[in-house]
Amino acid sequence: MSAEIEYIRNVFRSGFELTDITWSSWDEPGRIGVEHHVLWAPDAEQGEDSVGLLLRFPPTAHGDFHEHTGYELMLVLDGQLDHSDGVSYFKGDLVVEGPGTEHRMSSSSGCTVLAIRTKPAEARTPSKPIREVTPAA
């Protein structure tokens, strides 16, 4: 098996300008409007659980509410990423969440994110209402 190299120029462009890569709808319960480009996927044969993704959130799109069984790193490449705890992250912000953290990510205005998970996440039901962020007028 030969090693693969994927090269994406100027990844800090808006995901909606990144037309040189293939985006797929991320269709899972609780996810609305999120698109992804898989950089690498888990490989059970190699004992590898990690996944690397580019995520594209159009305005008002959101992921599911979930708990992390490993670490998750999110680098906002463009736009505004909104966390269910009410904090918003912007282009250049790096967020690292540890095992046991729970959240639902969304975007009120649209964003592109590099996401790396060391282990899978598990869907959960939130124990308190999720704080929604509304777009600025």
Predicted regions and their residues:
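Conserved short histidine dyad/triad with adjacent acidic residue
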Residues: D20, H36-H68, V87-S88, G98-E102
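Ligand-binding loop in jelly-roll beta-barrel domains
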Residues: P99-P126
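Short intrinsically disordered coil segments
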Residues: L54-L55, G70-E72, K128-P135
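A short, N-terminal "cap"/entry segment at the start of jelly-roll beta-barrel domains
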Residues: M1-E48, I130-A137
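A short beta-strand-loop-beta hairpin characteristic of the jelly-roll/cupin
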Residues: D64-D93
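Structural motif
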Residues: S50-G52, M74, C111
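Preference for bulky hydrophobic residues occupying beta-strand positions
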Residues: L55, L75, A115-I116
